[in-house]
Amino acid sequence: MSCLLIAASGTGGHLFPALAVAEALPESWKVSWLGVSDRLESSLIPKKYQLSTIGVEGVQSRGIKRIVQIFKLLAATGSVICLIRRNRIQIVLTTGGYIAVPAVLAAKLTGKKVILHESNAIPGKATRLLGRLCDKVALGWPPAKKKLPGCKVTVTGTPVRKSFLMKNKLPSWAPSGPGPLIVVIGGSQGAVGLNDMVRAVLPFLLDQGCRIVHITGKNAQSKIIHTNLVEQPFSDDIPGLLQNADLVISRSGAGALSEFAVCEVPAILVPYPYAADNHQECNAIYASQFGAALIVHQHEPEGKALRNALERLLKKNLSQADTVENLLNLMRKGMAKMAVRDAHIHLMSLLKEAS
């Protein structure tokens, strides 16, 4: 039996790729999970795997607070060392973020193999800091290589959960009818800027006969009531929505983009403007280079740039313009080219080599 510790915490972008790998592992593998008590994993992971939690945060402050953060990091590393020994862990897999620091340090101090997966087109701070300590750094996309000199890198793609690789029907609660289906994903925390931009163009889209599913996240719903509009804070039916959508409007996290790619759904991307190292902008640019997405910036006039992009993409659907192949079809092909459907297999191979 191989014993694996997965260190993944916080957002879906860190958790879901790790979950995709865990789902694909043979039953002979025993998986333990390392997370933080007040994050998404506390409600998601215990349903399937043994979850152990630690207190950890970035060392970014100054003065006394910085000293406290360093002591917390050392204590967290000690806790992970105890966990590795207690559960007889042989390999550590992490998807980056703050939790990667104590996980990688503990793995090296106990002589265990460690693999770090970086989804973004530009590697995060933890990946840049820890990459050389890892036995392998697996990348979602090739551009990240340039920022990781001296690391043992390999491009695997970013794993998506198996539900995205299966054929799914459109949920029965989604609006039905002939109009184009637009899915808006505000994210688990509720992307206020993105949601506000979308709400500014809702009347236009509904007047044109579009069907809209808006996953708002932790954000109040609009006051518009229409048979072609469904708003929900969360949904477990994202694979079915994406596979049957004509267009998705979303932030540009690497995990979400990987899901869009395997579902071959064209995207309008609104990068989160305050993301660390501007990584969402880099992700969006990478997708646009495949012709898979258009980029709209949040700082542009409210609703205007988004409406312009929508009018451009939906021209054939809205006005029946006589074109050989409309832009949405070309973008769908771009997403297909960007997709890596067997990323979980590549990562499993790395784990098996290390075991």
From Swiss-Prot:
Keyword Cell cycle annotated: yes
Topology relative to the membrane:
Peripheral membrane protein
Q: Which EC class heads this enzyme's classification?
A: transferase
Q: Where in the cell is it found?
A: Cell inner membrane
- What molecular function does GO assign, one term? undecaprenyldiphospho-muramoylpentapeptide beta-N-acetylglucosaminyltransferase activity
Q: Name one GO biological process term.
A: carbohydrate metabolic process
Q: Where does UDP-N-acetyl-alpha-D-glucosamine bind?
A: 11-13, 120, 161, 188, 280
Taken from the record, one Pfam family name reads Glyco_transf_28
Q: Which Gene3D superfamilies match?
A: Glycogen Phosphorylase B
Q: What is its main location?
A: membrane
Biological or metabolic pathway of the protein: Cell wall biogenesis; peptidoglycan biosynthesis
Q: What is its EC number?
A: 2.4.1.227
Function summary: Cell wall formation. Catalyzes the transfer of a GlcNAc subunit on undecaprenyl-pyrophosphoryl-MurNAc-pentapeptide (lipid intermediate I) to form undecaprenyl-pyrophosphoryl-MurNAc-(pentapeptide)GlcNAc (lipid intermediate II).
What family does the database annotate? Belongs to the glycosyltransferase 28 family. MurG subfamily.
The protein here is known as UDP-N-acetylglucosamine--N-acetylmuramyl-(pentapeptide) pyrophosphoryl-undecaprenol N-acetylglucosamine transferase
| Originating organism | Prochlorococcus marinus (strain MIT 9211)
